[in-house]
Amino acid sequence: MHVAAAAPDKLVDETRELAAQAHATGHPDALVGGLDPNEDLAELERQLDEQLTTKRFRGIRIMGEGDHAIPTPGILQALQDRGLLFELMVHPDALAPAAAALAGWELPVVVEHTGWPRSNDPEEHELWRAGMADLAGLRANVTCKLSGLAMPMQSMAAATFAPWIHHAIELFGTDRCMFASNFPVDGMHGSFDDLYTAYATVVAGLDDDARARLFADNAERLYRLD
């Protein structure tokens, strides 16, 4: 599973290259592309349609800060009309505004990087808790991707991850959460095995079915990894 890199002028090229790679190697099994929200809607729709020419394309995320990364109604309509998902990547101070913008839409939404906190600061944590509660309360089609914690926490320790992951699962439930990595960025703080060992430690108290949902089943369903 591949999610778009931060290359706003090469987003369609990236999807095209990944489609060729998948044809040759079988991987990635699915991909999330990107859009530049500064483009007019007709151009955005053209870019979506071009990326849809690969059967592995599942949706888009927008890279940016604050309101820039919150999709407009036009973008959401274009995605919904095409059966695509939207991956939300904003910091805690933009989670509540994002929830307001997403209210009422039926397309699948993925909250990336566990709501993307910037630090373990108590004020950041409170902003995060409030915004995540707003997003979790929208609808059953909003999922939390449990990822992206190693960089802001500068650690892959299970004890560091636990408060964030436990609260996200409390809000969204194990039916609407899934583990993911943020490699290669996560690699500054440990290995892939370190990351998933920490995840496994954090949820060791859950039953087998719940862990299966977090580590595989939910992602397979959402991204249609069949």
Regions found by a protein language model. Name each.
Residues M1-K10:
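Glycine-rich, proline-tolerant flexible connector loops at the mouths of alpha/beta enzymes
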Residues D9-A94, A100, K145-A150:
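Active-site gating/metal-coordination segments in enzymes
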Residues L11-D29, A162-E170, L195-V202:
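Short, electropositive alpha-helical surface patch
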Residues L18, L31, L79, H113, ...:
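Conserved, mostly hydrophobic/aromatic
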Residues E39, W116, V185:
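Short, glycine/acidic-enriched loop or turn micro-motifs at the edges of active sites
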Residues A69-M178:
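Catalytic pocket-lining loop regions of alpha/beta-barrel enzymes
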Residues P71, I75, L84, L107-V110, ...:
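A generic "structured core" feature
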Residues H167, L171-M178, G187-D226:
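Mid-to-C-terminal alpha-helical segments outside catalytic/metal-binding sites
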